């Protein structure tokens, strides 16, 4: 997720903006930039750390209105051209803006604007907004006279934009103003004396003011040094409540959450939405994966998928194996990367290798990818980090648009990895004639409901917290799943081990009687994923089996399941959904269970002992 700041005051804007951007460094970024309204629109950008940007900015830069941005690449590689702010207006530049979000229809808008004479300097979706705004104000690339003011032009431009945005915009022709807009991306205004602030996060300006106004979806705002005006969707001026922020800085960078992990569990709602953005069309029943360097004929010729991953990414890959085989009818193998290199794999013609890595720098995964590429096997990387090593080595790359993940234990990156695997499997199945367009339309309808369904789970997290606290002193946990829920059982056990230091094991429920049941004793907590589907009745039998050994059963089940309560001691509910998508909901419950167990045990949740976020050694 990018960081946005804006300043309208009487002091030099550049130092204030740089200071604010530094407060947002924790979010992660690959480049940064600043625009100040001085003698004109003056923009400075740099790749890498903010200190690199500081060295580009003249010490005596004047101008008391400005915007700044830290970028986490989603469209286009990290570069000065792709860094924000983005400008429009030729010579001289008229408009400069910063943007957080994803514009889903940017390619169509870009093609149209190029046809109208606008020149693009970057690979980003954001530059489209700058030129579109210029068009609505000045009429053409070389237009000099404004037909609209900045606010009116922005409103017109936003009518053409599909996607999410938090925008801060300034204009050479309206020197005293900073204009804002928001839809599905956070934006907050800070109220000062003789100065006002804007940011994607209160952290940016907390040292200047604790009085804030939160901008809501479809609202626009105009800031000057002495005033703040906020307008609703129809352009009517509206009164907004002023909030007093009591958080300290450390709490503020976590947006009020106690830990980054809890914040990132909640961010799965927006992360999944962003990962789906621009990739699915419910109307057409289509899935668009333009980054995939495989045409339909090549997809039809695939005989095998080889997944390579480690840790949490391996659990995502295991679910992916089930999806490729069940939906697309393609044989799929999955290997732990550290093992793959040493087993002398038998290669098959028509194989696609898929490497899954959160950081794109996992040493074992990179080594496995290099091994399989030595056989001339095409490779697809699924990662969260633009410009990482794997993105430079794989033939194709699909990005999880989860934003920076600070907590060591993966949460939102796991969910977004799953989203891409679902889309790949359904895309392959459609191309290969295994699924009908009508089914795909239905699938898209259902997967787009997932963010809202996750929010329902988050709304009942106190129930999960109570359950976790009751068993925080347990020495061992058992997680059971069947079919699509088996990888989720493995992931739930790993999460508990990682952050609470409790021994936990995930099992295919049908394997209990082949050994693990010997470990059960009175009161042992057993987490059984028992959402409705083809294995539901068998899971009920497994629950009865462990209850007969006096274990304590915590079931994850659908909200409308009236049967499960007869057998489980505690039921943690998830919304009823398509069986295929249930893992996306069940895992959120297990993430919260692990989090609250670790909290009750007073563990270092964001930085658990002996673990690192990116494992760059073999």
UniProtKB/Swiss-Prot annotation:
This protein's UniProt keywords: Aminotransferase, Cytoplasm, Glutamine amidotransferase, Repeat, Transferase
EC number: 2.6.1.16
GO cellular component terms, semicolon-separated: cytoplasm
InterPro entries hit by this protein: GATase_2_dom (IPR017932), GFAT (IPR005855), GFAT_N (IPR047084), GlmS/AgaS_SIS (IPR035466), GlmS/FrlB_SIS (IPR035490), Ntn_hydrolases_N (IPR029055), SIS_dom (IPR001347), SIS_dom_sf (IPR046348)
Domain annotation SIS: ranges: 295-434, 467-608
Pfam families listed in its UniProt record: GATase_6, SIS
Location(s), subcellular: Cytoplasm
Region: Disordered, residue numbers: 72-91
Active-site positions on this chain: 2, 613
All residue ranges annotated as the Glutamine amidotransferase type-2 domain in the record: 2-226
Catalytic activity: D-fructose 6-phosphate + L-glutamine = D-glucosamine 6-phosphate + L-glutamate
Domain of life according to the entry: Archaea
Biological process according to GO: carbohydrate metabolic process; fructose 6-phosphate metabolic process; protein N-linked glycosylation; UDP-N-acetylglucosamine metabolic process
Record's function text: Catalyzes the first step in hexosamine metabolism, converting fructose-6P into glucosamine-6P using glutamine as a nitrogen source.
UniProt subunit comment: Homodimer.
UniProt cross-references to HAMAP family, sorted A to Z: GlmS
Protein name: Glutamine--fructose-6-phosphate aminotransferase [isomerizing]
Gene: glmS
């Amino acid at each position: 997720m990018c960081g946005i700041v804006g300043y309208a005051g009487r002091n030099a804007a550049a130092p204030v903006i740089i200071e604010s951007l530094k407060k947002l460094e924790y979010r992660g970024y690959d480049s940064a930039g600043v625009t100040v309204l001085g003698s004109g629109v003056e923009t400075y950008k740099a790749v890498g750390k903010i200190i690199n940007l500081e060295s580009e900015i003249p010490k005596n830069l004047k101008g008391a209105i400005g915007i700044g941005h830290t970028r986490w690449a989603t469209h286009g590689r990290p570069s000065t051209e792709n860094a924000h702010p983005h400008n429009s207006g030729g010579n001289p530049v008229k408009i400069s803006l910063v943007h957080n979000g994803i514009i889903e229809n940017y390619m169509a808008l870009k093609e149209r604007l190029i046809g109208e004479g606008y020149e693009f300097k970057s690979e980003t979706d954001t530059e489209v907004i700058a030129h579109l705004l210029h068009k609505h104000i000045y009429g053409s690339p070389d237009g000099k006279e404004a037909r609209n003011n900045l606010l009116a032009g922005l409103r017109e431009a936003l009518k053409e934009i599909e996607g999410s945005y938090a925008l801060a915009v300034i204009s050479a022709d309206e020197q005293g103003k900073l204009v804002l807009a928001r839809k599905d991306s956070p934006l907050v205004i800070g109220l000062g004396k003789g100065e006002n602030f804007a940011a994607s996060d209160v952290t940016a300006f907390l040292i200047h003011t604790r009085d804030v106004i939160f901008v809501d979806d479809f609202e626009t705002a105009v800031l000057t040094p002495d005033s703040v005006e906020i307008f609703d969707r129809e352009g009517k001026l509206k009164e907004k409540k002023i909030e007093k922020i009591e958080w300290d800085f450390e709490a503020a960078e976590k947006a009020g959450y106690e830990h980054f992990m809890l914040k990132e569990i909640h961010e799965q709602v927006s992360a999944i939405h962003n990962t789906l953005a621009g990739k699915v069309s419910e109307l057409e029943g289509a899935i668009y994966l333009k980054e995939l360097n495989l045409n339909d004929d090549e997809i039809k010729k695939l005989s095998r998928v080889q997944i390579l991953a480690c840790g949490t990414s391996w659990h995502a890959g295991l679910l992916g194996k089930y999806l490729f085989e069940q939906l697309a009818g393609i044989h799929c193998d999955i290997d732990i990367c550290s093992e793959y290199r040493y087993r002398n794999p038998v290669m098959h013609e028509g194989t696609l290798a898929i490497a899954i890595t959160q950081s794109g720098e996992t040493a074992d995964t990179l080594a496995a990818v290099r091994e399989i590429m030595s056989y001339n096997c095409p490779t697809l990387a699924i990662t969260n980090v633009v410009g990482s090593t794997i993105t430079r080595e794989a033939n194709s790359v699909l990005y999880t648009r989860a934003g920076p993940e600070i907590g060591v234990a993966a949460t939102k990156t796991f969910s977004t990895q799953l989203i891409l695997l679902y889309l790949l499997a359904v895309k392959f199945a459609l191309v290969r004639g295994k699924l009908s367009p009508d089914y795909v339309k239905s699938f898209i309808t259902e997967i787009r409901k997932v963010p809202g369904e996750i929010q329902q789970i988050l709304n009942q997290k106190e129930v999960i917290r109570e359950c976790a606290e009751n068993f925080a002193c347990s020495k061992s946990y058992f997680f059971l799943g069947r079919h699509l829920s088996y990888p989720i059982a493995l992931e739930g056990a790993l999460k508990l081990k990682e952050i609470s230091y409790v021994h936990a094991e995930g099992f295919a429920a049908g394997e209990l009687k082949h050994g693990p049941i010997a470990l059960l004793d009175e009161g042992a907590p057993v987490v059984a994923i028992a959402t409705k589907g083809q294995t539901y009745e068998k899971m009920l039998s497994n629950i009865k089996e462990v209850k007969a050994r006096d274990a304590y059963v915590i079931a994850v089940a659908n909200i409308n399941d009236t049967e499960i309560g007869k057998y489980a001691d505690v039921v943690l509910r998830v919304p009823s959904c398509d069986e295929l998508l249930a893992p996306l909901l069940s895992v959120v419950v297990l993430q919260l269970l692990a989090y609250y167990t670790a909290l009750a045990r007073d563990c270092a949740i964001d930085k658990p002992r002996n673990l690192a976020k990116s494992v760059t050694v073999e």
